[in-house]
A protein has these predicted regions:
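Globin-like tetrapyrrole-binding proteins
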Residues: 1-106
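Surface-exposed loop/turn and secondary-structure junction residues enriched for glycine/proline
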Residues: 6, 14, 47-49, 72, ...
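Acidic-glycine-rich active-site phosphate/pyrophosphate-binding loop
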Residues: 28-34, 189-197
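Short acidic/polar capping segments at secondary-structure boundaries
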Residues: 83, 116-117, 200-201
Length: 207
């Protein structure tokens, strides 16, 4: 599900920024843009072998948006830009994965504390539900929580970590009356188990 919907549109925006930068600066890459995208991808557990699938959904979205303007020449040019950026991201993401205390992309975490703070916000604290080694986290990093949606599909939602004790992960979830995922997270109780992608540093707030 992370490869459909808003994900291709968000990535398309980053690729446009990347393309503009390399046109203006032919001998360098936009490190800040690449870092931001790489950390988001790593927080979702995206791996090198998934980039062709990302390409498929991305270019389907581009073709739908451009219509007849998506000529073979334009598609070829943007494909080249995609793989220039993609290969740079793959290198960065490999470094992020190598810095972790484990080699898994996600593991089970249980809710150990739940506090309602008003204004439809609940603060959830998680601890590992198994013995998977954890890298120490800090407030402000990315985290992705994976829960089953009402239709049975599993979906990931990114949040920014709050400060917490060692081996804990804490997030604040604001209820969106029109959003399915926030209502599911609001219904979690102490003892419930979810899957969590391993934490990566962030460089900007998660929207």
């Amino acid at each position: 599900s992370q490869l459909e919907g808003t994900q291709p549109r968000a990535l398309a925006g980053s690729i446009a920024v990347f393309a503009s930068y390399i046109v203006e600066h032919p001998n360098s890459y936009p490190d800040e843009v690449l870092s931001r995208v790489a950390h988001k991808h790593a927080s979702l557990g995206l791996k090198e072998e998934e980039y062709p699938t990302v390409y498929k959904y991305l270019f389907e979205a581009i073709a739908a948006n451009l219509g007849d303007l998506a000529t073979p020449e334009i598609v070829e040019a943007w494909t080249e830009v995609y793989w220039l950026m993609g290969n740079a991201l793959i290198k960065l993401e490999k470094g992020l994965y190598a810095s972790q205390a484990n080699d898994v992309t996600r593991a089970p975490f249980k809710v150990v504390d739940r506090k309602e703070t008003g204004e439809n916000v609940v603060v959830l604290t998680f601890e590992p539900a198994d013995d998977t080694p954890m890298t120490e986290s800090k407030g402000g990093q990315y985290i992705s929580i994976v829960v089953p949606a009402r239709d049975g599909l599993r979906q990931a939602r990114q949040y920014t970590l709050l400060p917490s004790e060692k081996n804990q992960r804490r997030i604040a979830v604001k209820l969106d009356p029109n959003g399915e995922m926030t209502s599911i997270l609001h219904e979690l109780k102490v003892g419930d188990v979810v899957e969590k992608h391993f934490t990566r540093d962030r460089v900007e707030d998660v929207k």
